[in-house]
């Protein structure tokens, strides 16, 4: 019998509910499916006996408290665990998870009956790390949703375990499940005071051992290119092709500083959205860099290119809206490494080697840390996230739940 008897069942139930976020929405949460899912989590938390369960109208988060069972917890830090409920911008309708029991670490895993989508060790060598594991995969038509419903299931199962085992001493624990992490707005209205933790963790990482406290600095740039459309037969010296302006802008950026050509601490510009006509074109970029100075230089370059093009054109035909999204939380956490050190100790106590390296992305913890609550990121188990080749090991999910409990125990000492 599994240590956390409802962990996998809970996860499978969660992923079958669509909770895709929508960056074009103006509501919080951005989709009604997230609203309903979070209401369901609130009821589940109440059913487990957690207290002060409430959903914030401002942020969409559900917060809950597991009271301390210590005789004296005056010197025990209140710890929080946070995960997001939304899934990335990929088909998440009618998720049909499949379980591959006792994977041999070598065989191809056919996702769909036709064999159009296959997990292979040649393309995904990390599969070799999972010999003997039970893997949950997709059926090839959707993502899985382990990012981050594995984290939700792990936190929920840890709380359930603590309630069933009152002999485990712990201080006060806070739980937060929120929306819209995938579109970068989830933590914008996170209320640190209402949450009430001294330190916190997002459970939103990948493979076993991941412990992250360094993220990108991040910004988004939306550009509008204004053209002039006339008949092609009389276009000479009159037509201004907005599509060509967008191409010229893109070609002015460093060709090798893109996601597919960078790694580690190397930053990039990423053009991920384009639409347009001769009359008007629109592009959207994300700008990423771990180094704040380089980050600011990247943003300035984008502004400078727009200004130069407008000067050459003799009028404003390139309009740029540049907005910061989040910052590298290392700036906050390196001032007080308590949360990181405790997570490292917890993993080592469990025989897990902490894998610490800069995240080529961000978490809700990036924003929450800058709000005054240090929030590094713990592994949740997912691999190949955001697409049809996503999978997760049930054994790694169990280990992630173990780490949550070990952190709680260490803080209670």
From Swiss-Prot:
Co-factor note (free text): Binds 2 Zn(2+) ions per subunit.
Cited InterPro entries: ArgE/DapE_CS, Bact_exopeptidase_dim_dom, Peptidase_M20, Peptidase_M20_dimer, Peptidase_M20B
GO biological process: peptide catabolic process; proteolysis
Keywords: Aminopeptidase, Cytoplasm, Hydrolase, Metal-binding, Metalloprotease, Protease, Zinc
Localization in the cell: Cytoplasm
GO molecular function: metallopeptidase activity; tripeptide aminopeptidase activity; zinc ion binding
Entry's EC annotation: 3.4.11.4
Cofactor(s) this protein cannot do without: Zn(2+)
Pfam families on file: M20_dimer, Peptidase_M20
GO cellular component, one term: cytosol
Binding site for Zn(2+) 2: 147, 182, 386
Catalysed reactions, semicolon-separated: Release of the N-terminal residue from a tripeptide
Transmembrane segments: none
Catalytic center residues: 86, 181
Binding of Zn(2+) 1, residues: 84, 147, 204
Entry's family note: Belongs to the peptidase M20B family.
Job of this protein: Cleaves the N-terminal amino acid of tripeptides.
NCBIfam families: peptidase-T, PRK05469.1, PRK13381.1
PANTHER family linked to this entry: PEPTIDASE T
Protein name in the entry: Peptidase T
Species this protein is from: Ligilactobacillus salivarius (strain UCC118)
